[in-house]
A protein has these predicted regions:
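Flexible phosphate-sensing "switch/lid" loops adjacent to ATP/NTP-binding sites
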Residues: 1-145
Length: 145
């Protein structure tokens, strides 16, 4: 798992580099980020949305991007709301309270997605989000350890 001290510190690039290294070394490798927040998304061949960073990480692995590589995506939409994308499909706009009320369901989706990748690939390079030291978010954190 790749973690950092905050947002914008290079986790996505480092994850892509590890993906490429292990792919070139002959491993069947895939990227994974449980939850991502970004204004822009990548649209798969199936018309599903996922994080752009996970899309280029998939390409570094020699793979077509799949939404299980980034099962939950939040797109800030203003007024403390975010559009929630689950497995590539929009679920509507939610504030933090409404989003966290679905924590158990989201955790199941994240776990199922990771399990599917682990069954298909020899290595799964996991990217964390923000900082794992944000104690106030620990109870709801789906992305870090």
């Amino acid at each position: 798992m790749i973690q950092g001290t905050g947002s914008g510190v290079g986790k996505s690039l480092l994850t892509a580099a590890f993906c490429r290294y292990f792919y070139k070394a002959g491993y069947k490798v895939a990227p994974f980020k449980a939850q991502n927040m970004a204004l822009n998304s990548f649209v798969t061949e199936r018309g599903e949305e996922m994080g752009r960073a996970q899309a280029y990480q998939a390409e570094a692995c020699g793979l077509k991007p799949e939404v299980i590589m980034n099962p939950i995506m939040l797109k800030p939409s203003g007024n403390n709301n975010s559009q929630v994308i689950v497995l590539g499909k929009p679920e509507g706009s939610r504030n933090a309270k409404d989003f966290y009320a679905r924590h158990i369901r989201h955790k199941e989706i994240v776990t199922q997605s990771l399990d599917e990748l682990r069954n298909k690939y020899e290595l799964v390079i996991i990217e964390g989000a923000g900082s794992p030291a944000e104690i106030n978010l620990r109870e709801w954190d789906l992305v870090n350890m």
